[in-house]
Design a protein with these regions (language model features):
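Short, acidic Gly/Pro/Ser/Thr-rich loop/turn segments
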Residues: 63-65, 169, 281, 295
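Accessory C-terminal segments flanking Radical SAM cores
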Residues: 240-331
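A generic secondary-structure signal marking the coil-to-beta-strand transition
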Residues: 50-54, 67, 158-160, 234-235, ...
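Radical SAM enzyme core and accessory elements
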Residues: 1-44, 289-331
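Conserved C-terminal portion of the radical SAM core fold
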Residues: 98-102, 154-164, 179-248
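Conserved alpha-helical substructure of the radical SAM core
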Residues: 23-105, 109-120, 124-127
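Canonical radical SAM enzyme core domain
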Residues: 76-90, 108-152, 160, 164-186, ...
Length: 331
């Protein structure tokens, strides 16, 4: 057993009696054993199938504090610090061929070296998917000039996915603060006018079906002058609502057949994320984009380490977001 696998096992034991970030990372005791469920059944795991998307988390600092942010980003949360070009380059050098590189946060456009990181990614031939709220950090003159230059050089290989928690301004602002919807729309118009490739990330309300949500987001996109097909999941991704302190069923090996799903389709089969913790000597790799606070899902200091062993699905979000919710952060 390697050092990182030993750390993950110990973290699993500790979770039986601890809560990680009491609401959003509430972990019921039944998820504490990485191999066996509370009923004694074999817990499902996901093996590595090859890199589709490498995520770079530029840090948890954000210009706003959303009520239900998946990783609780805010103007004061710096538990994940800004990535630098020096942090990122070793991971890019590990990659064979070209893949999708995703950049998330926090708000990536607050990262001081974000334009250089984007250049390093695309100059190697990778496609880039950057997640942003399209608000004031992106609209600073230095960032605007840099984005226009990158768009002119790399064209459709650069996609900015803008987060809109609802197509309804009141609901969006209740999540992100008064005026947030209008400010995001201003950023979207600016991107569209300059020919930057844009996608949207929304949330499907619990009382709203997929087709209704897509039609409403499509109407909004059209009003902003965006060339976006709401039926295309690459243009509009709708994430399942995450319920704080949710207690979903555990996923066993038998669930794949029962649900008609494959482990190969789960995010951690082909995606990983690079983070750097505050005070850490170097960047490390997590199993996915959501579980950055749980040490059981911090898998190593290189992509080779972080893809050596299957990921055990012993977290409620593995069930509610990925397996049952069908969520994936990549395009």
């Amino acid at each position: 057993m390697g050092v990182w696998q030993a750390k993950a096992l110990e973290a699993g034991r500790e979770r039986a009696t601890h809560l990680y970030m009491a609401d959003t990372n509430f972990v019921p005791a039944k998820f504490s054993d990485p191999d066996v469920t509370a009923k004694g059944e074999t817990r499902a795991s996901v093996g590595w199938t090859g890199l589709k998307t490498l995520w770079l988390n530029t840090g948890t600092l954000c210009n706003i504090e959303c009520a239900n942010c998946y990783i609780e980003s805010s103007p004061t949360n710096d538990r994940l610090v800004y990535l630098t070009r020096a942090d990122v380059r070793p991971f890019l050098e590990e990659i064979d061929g070209t893949v999708e590189i995703g950049i998330t946060g926090g708000e990536p456009f607050m990262c001081p070296e974000i334009l250089g990181i984007m250049e390093d990614v695309m100059s190697r031939g990778h496609s880039l998917l950057l997640l942003t709220n399209a608000m004031r950090p992106m609209m600073r003159p230095r960032l605007q000039q840099g984005l226009e230059a990158l768009a002119a050089q790399y064209g459709p290989r650069m996609v900015l996915r803008v987060s809109l928690d609802s197509h309804d301004p009141a609901i969006h602002d209740a999540e992100r603060g008064a005026g947030a919807f209008e400010e995001a729309c201003k950023g979207l118009r600016w991107l569209g006018e300059r020919g930057v490739q844009v996608a949207l990330a929304g949330r499907q309300a619990l009382n709203e079906d997929d087709s209704t949500a897509r039609a409403a987001y499509g109407a909004l996109a059209a009003s902003l002058g965006l060339k976006l097909n709401p039926a295309d999941t690459k243009h509009l991704v709708l994430f399942p609502e995450m319920i704080a302190r949710d207690d979903p069923p555990e996923i066993t090996t038998d669930c794949w057949g029962i649900l008609g799903k494959s482990a190969d389709d789960i995010m951690c089969a082909n995606q990983r994320m690079v983070i750097r913790r505050k005070g850490a000597g170097r960047a490390t790799v997590t199993a996915c984009t959501l579980l950055v606070d749980d040490p059981a899902f911090e898998l190593g200091e290189t992509l080779a380490e972080a893809t050596a062993d299957p990921v055990k699905l012993n977290h409620p979000w593995c069930a509610s977001f990925c397996v049952l919710g069908g969520g994936s952060c990549s395009a």
